[in-house]
Swiss-Prot record:
Key word Chaperone present: no
Tissues and organs where the protein is expressed, per its UniProt entry: Expressed by the skin glands.
Family of the protein in this entry: Belongs to the frog skin active peptide (FSAP) family. Phylloseptin subfamily.
Record-linked Pfam families: FSAP_sig_propep
Species this chain originates from: Pithecopus azureus (Orange-legged monkey tree frog)
UniProt protein name: Phylloseptin-Az3
Length: 66
């Protein structure tokens, strides 16, 4: 009977360890996806902030040559 209890305890322990590892990997994946979304948004903001500068430069060149 003691052997059965030890075996059951071992199976439950190993199951909990593997479940914990899976949850940790899932959290890391979710964090990476969230960080990637933030990076994409910041790149978009940087690009959008360059548009007025580019328009001003083009209009200045047009005035200079036109």
């Amino acid at each position: 009977m003691a052997f059965l209890k030890k075996s059951l305890f071992l199976v439950l322990f190993l199951g909990l360890v593997s479940l914990s590892i899976c949850e940790e990997e899932k959290r890391e994946t979710e964090e990476e996806e969230y960080n990637q979304e933030d990076d994409d948004k910041s790149e978009e903001k940087r690009f959008l902030s360059l548009i007025p500068t580019a328009i001003n430069a083009v209009s200045a060149l047009a005035k200079h040559f036109g």
